[in-house]
Amino acid sequence: VIDSTHARMSEVFHPDGGSWKRSDMPRTSFVFLNAEEGLSPEEQSRAAHREAKAALGAYWNALEGTIDPSKVENAAQNALIGNAEEIAQQIVERFHPEDRIMAWFDFFNHDSERVCRDMTAYMEQVAPRVENILTGA
């Protein structure tokens, strides 16, 4: 669906806007990153999965009034969840190298200091790792 949308947009995009680029249509993804100090990569991963499950469960509960485990599981499959290395791998596996990702870090997380740490870890650990994987460095 996404590739066909890009193909269609490249044909109909107004010339005044320049040529269509994949980055013109950001891909939205919830990010449940745990890069907290004092935890092993395995502990970070487990904590990120717990945090994602709780947040996504609350999301579906708020939308529909009941928690449907299959919907929580499906939403979790679309989110980026884990420690920095896991999220870098998920980005490379799921997204085209020219995609622009609109990452949501604060989804149901009201701890602004933690959200800031997560965003910093994403830019300092995840983004460079993705670049290294894509360039073979």
Regions found by a protein language model. Give the residues of each.
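A generic structural signal for solvent-exposed, polar alpha-helical segments
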Residues: 65-66, 110, 127-128
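Conserved strand-to-helix beginnings and helix N-cap segments that scaffold or border functional pockets
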Residues: 2-3, 113-119
